[in-house]
Curated annotation (Swiss-Prot):
PROSITE patterns cross-referenced by the UniProt entry: ATP_GRASP
Keyword Repeat found: no
Enzyme Commission numbers on file: 6.3.2.29, 6.3.2.30
InterPro entries, sorted: ATP-grasp, ATP-grasp_RimK-type, Cya_phycin_syn, Cyanophycin_syn_N, Mur-like_cat_sf, Mur_ligase_C, Mur_ligase_C_dom_sf, Mur_ligase_cen
Protein name per its UniProtKB record: Cyanophycin synthetase
Length: 901
């Protein structure tokens, strides 16, 4: 077997709308292409020996052991690889269950789809599954050592990339509230919400957390001085920089017992408490110097260690922290008790799980020695042996919830302290013998104020009630049930995507909002180009959704991006599907128009239930998407007599209809007339029906988002098929005694659309400079030739600079084949170089003629036209003598009239 390609999906996709995290592996079975598993000697036995846990996979039989039944009876190797990849992840602690295996149009090549939690782990699992299956085919077994290494590698990948427990709690709460989130470049840096409404967090610091507060909290001594000056009970202490000053510092704080800790440490690193001798003090000083140059010496206060969490000025949780310890059973040594407690599945390395495994350090041995024990000692039953002086969870400690026990005065004091320091989220370390009584009564003290406090002890205490502290954070960042979202409008289809996206963005600008939009020619925010290029995939969508100024996102969503990575967002408010026609077939294992329709349907299916799928009622494949989506439906149609639309409106639906020469919104008993087509520059005076359809779709998408009819009308009237607003989309130039038209038509449907306009526009001679992308099918090029023969009087066949792997001259030959099939006496020539072909077309243009250029490079075509001298770009305006498609006379011009639909 051979892996041909591995792709990672991260959003709604062709395989699943709900499951975003999928690996798609293109697998060539090679010699196993026609060999089911039951025909491979020893394969079943070898697979069961390697992975007996596959017994739990149901598969199509729908019962325990169902998958292994399939293997015994005979199934193809791609299917087995799918299940093995899922099981390897499961054994590494990643609970995944979704998978699909489908044969492609190429015999023996399969697409194997597996769910993942961690991207790198998912890709590793796919490769390991192929290795495992191939090994069993070749040798009858997969070495146990290799399997163990695979599982360990997967565990390491999962641990290294997983969100920390605090971040995970925040993300889960965001998902619960329907707030979208995304992980940014740093491991714990996340974004909650989109655009102008988004917030960012790193660990438990928010973008509202003041840097002065953080800096102050990190300077333990400065914090203590400020709090002491405010009458807050804090430990007596001082800061030293040299060992020679230690003895004097001990005297200053009142003698032993003392605490020594680094000035700017965290997570308990370098801290030693309950120091009772000079030898211990020297060792503690050296340990603290490993973390910081400046050392704090404080008086040691006896009591219980409490963490009080304050969010947005309010105490939301309190936990008593208990240092790492074991409890004797009268039989086991301390070393054995530690090993036993570390087997707890809730304990992991670092912050992986709710508890951390106990690891010993210098202070551990000191504590044992002070208690008269060694690791080989057997403590009596019930005896507590402390292994750490500090109670941090990161050193193996545990937590007991005390939220309901804290005294009101202590709540007031904690909230006051956090305001003094200036933090929105803070964790206070309080030492007192009883948190239910005021600190002042028990000589309790506030030891530290921590920025970015951990949430583990509160969301998963060892004893007591788990507290939803992440909910308090969400309430602070998104008050009054705010969602953090901005309107997202996604536009897809075979043709018209860029024009419709630009028009929709232009209409939305009439509302005064900042619009971010992506197209095949670039990413834009407001009136400014952010990045040029074909930016119709998820990465470009993220640029818009991460921008803090964007209030509305209009995203052109192309086929390629959906296939490669899925959508760049979880859900949209509006999903527009313009049409589905033959293009890109045979690429990415999308071989039929129906498969292409299923791919583009992802946009319609990913709309929020309270949003709208805007669908073309005149395209049966697009109209059928209404059955797949949970969103509301809005249709647009060029046919005012559409039965589908009539029934939809009767049921209370909304539609955009081209009727009597008007673009109209129809809802219930009323028709809201927006504008006559001939008044809309984009429609070329009403002579470009495909542009009318694009305008209908954009108007309807804006309308269902509560953009007013007046604002829609203003947008339509001021948007032009020009180089500045729609480069490469029906750009018409007046070159004196002839005209040139530039359009990025590159598939049969777009050729037909351009042809309809050309026939309406001129009766003069029509010259076409035609071609197509090299990665299309042979039959597609033949079809382009046939259409060109029907449209143009003279044809110049050229090829793209980038032939996309096709031999030079091949595409041209296929196009000319199509030309001669339709018109054997057609006038044509082949000039493969695009620049030469365009110049030839312009050179031979007759008076009153039209040169139609369908280029690979729009910018090059426009530049060559402008080199011709004085060139005027024509923008079609209202023309009373213009023939409008399907125009009817005698219609009232009011914007709202009663309708009979």
């Amino acid at each position: 077997m051979r892996i041909l390609k591995i792709q990672t999906l991260r959003g709604p996709n062709y395989w699943s709308i709900r499951r975003h995290k999928l690996i798609v592996m293109r697998l060539d079975l090679e010699t196993l292409a026609e060999t089911p598993s039951n025909e491979i000697p020893g394969f079943y036995e070898g697979l069961v020996e390697a992975l007996p846990s596959l017994e739990g996979h149901y598969c199509s039989p729908g019962c325990h052991g169902g998958f292994l039944m399939r293997v015994r009876e005979g199934t193809m190797m791609g299917h087995i690889v799918e299940h093995v990849a899922l099981e390897l992840q499961e054994l590494a602690g990643m609970h995944v269950g979704f998978g699909r295996t489908r044969e492609t149009a190429t015999p023996g090549i399969y697409q194997v789809v597996i769910e993942y939690l961690n991207e790198e782990a998912g890709r590793y699992a796919g490769r390991a599954a192929v290795r495992l299956c191939q090994s069993i085919v070749d040798r009858g077994r997969y070495p146990k050592a290799e399997l163990e290494q695979d599982i360990q590698d997967l565990k390491d990948l999962w641990r290294d990339a997983s969100l920390g427990p605090s971040t995970e709690a925040i993300v889960k709460e965001a998902e619960k509230r329907g707030i979208p989130w995304m992980q940014l470049s740093a491991r714990f840096l996340i974004q909650l919400g989109y655009g102008v409404n988004h917030k960012r967090m790193q660990a438990t610091m928010t973008d509202k957390t003041g840097i002065l507060g953080v800096e102050l909290a990190c300077d333990k001594e400065a914090t203590k001085r400020i709090l002491a000056a405010s009458g807050v009970p804090v430990p007596r202490g001082t800061v030293i920089n040299f060992l020679d000053d230690l003895e004097e510092a001990i005297e200053y704080v009142g003698g032993y017992p003392i605490v020594i800790k680094p000035l700017d440490g965290n997570h308990g690193r370098g801290i030693t408490i309950d120091i009772r001798s000079w030898e211990e003090a020297e060792a503690a000083y050296e340990a603290a110097r490993q973390v910081s140059r400046s050392i704090i010496v404080e008086r040691y206060y006896v009591g219980r260690d409490h963490r009080v969490l304050v969010v947005d000025g309010k105490v939301v949780a309190v936990a008593e922290r208990v240092p790492a310890h074991v409890i004797g059973n009268g039989r086991s040594t301390i070393a054995e008790l530690i090993e036993e407690i570390n087997q707890d599945p809730n304990r992991g390395d670092g912050h992986d799980k709710v508890l951390t495994k106990i690891e010993l350090d210098r202070t551990s041995y000191q504590l044992l020695e002070r208690a008269g024990y060694t690791l080989n000692s057997v403590p009596p039953k019930g005896t507590i042996c402390y292994l750490r002086a500090t109670a941090n969870l990161s050193t193996g400690g545990t937590a007991v919830d005390r939220t309901d026990e804290i005294h009101p005065e202590n709540i007031w004091l904690a909230q006051r302290v956090v305001k003094i320091i200036g933090l929105d989220i803070a964790g206070l370390d309080i030492v007192t013998t009883d948190i239910s009584r005021p600190l002042r009564e028990l000589d309790g003290v506030i030891v530290e104020v921590n920025a970015a406090p951990g949430f583990r002890m509160h969301v998963a205490p060892s004893q007591g009630i788990p507290r939803n502290v992440a909910g308090a954070v969400m309430d602070m960042l998104f008050p009054n049930e705010q969602s953090g979202r901005i309107p997202i409008l996604s536009v897809t289809g075979t043709n018209g995507k860029t024009t419709t996206t630009r028009l929709l963005a232009h209409i939305y600008k009439q509302t005064g909002k900042v619009v971010g939009y992506t197209t095949t020619d670039g990413t834009y925010i407001g009136d400014y180009l952010v990045e040029s290029g074909d930016n119709t995939g998820p990465q470009s969508a993220h640029v818009i959704l991460q921008d803090p100024t964007v209030e509305v996102a209009v995203l052109e969503t192309a086929r390629g991006g959906i296939l490669r990575s899925g959508l760049g967002f979880e859900s949209a408010n509006v999903g527009v599907v313009l049409n589905v026609a033959a293009d890109h077939l045979g690429i990415g294992d999308i071989d039929t128009i129906d498969q292409l329709a299923n791919l583009k349907s992802v946009v319609a299916e990913s709309v929020y239930p309270d949003g709208y799928a805007v669908l073309n009622a005149d395209d049966r494949r697009v109209a059928a998407m209404a059955e797949k989506t949970k969103a509301n439906i809005a249709y647009f149609t060029m046919n005012p007599d559409s039965e589908l639309v009539r029934k939809h409106i009767q049921k209370g639906g909304v539609a955009a209809v081209y009727e009597n020469g008007y673009l109209s919104i129809v809802k219930g008993d009323w028709t809201h007339r927006i504008e006559r087509a001939e008044q809309i520059p984009l429609t070329m005076g009403g002579r470009a029906p495909f542009m009318i359809a694009n305008a209908l779709a954009a108007s309807l998408a804006a309308f269902v988002q509560n953009v007013s009819i007046e604002q829609i009308r203003a947008g339509l009237r001021t948007f032009r098929a020009s180089v500045s607003q729609t480069p490469g989309r029906m750009n018409l130039f007046n070159l004196g005694n002839y005209h040139a038209l530039v359009d990025y038509a590159h598939n049969p449907a777009s050729y037909e659309a351009v042809g309809a306009f050309v026939r309406n526009w001129t009766s003069g001679q029509r010259i076409g400079v035609v071609g197509g992308p090299g990665d299309r099918r042979d039959e597609d090029f033949v079809t382009l030739g046939k259409l060109a023969a029907e449209i143009f009087d003279y044809i110049i066949v050229k090829e793209d600079d980038d032939t996309r792997g096709r031999p030079r001259g091949s595409a041209s030959a296929l196009i000319t084949k199509g030309i001669t099939q339709v018109k054997p006496d057609a006038r044509y020539e082949s000039i493969l170089d695009e620049t030469q072909a365009i110049n030839k077309g312009l050179d031979m243009a007759p008076a009153n003629g039209l040169v139609v250029i369908l280029p690979e490079s729009v910018s090059r075509a426009i530049k060559l036209i402008k080199l011709r001298g004085l060139v005027k770009e024509e923008i079609q305006q209202q023309n009373p003598s213009t023939t409008v498609i399907d125009n009817q006379n005698g219609v009232a011009s009011s914007s709202v009239i009663n309708t009979l639909l």
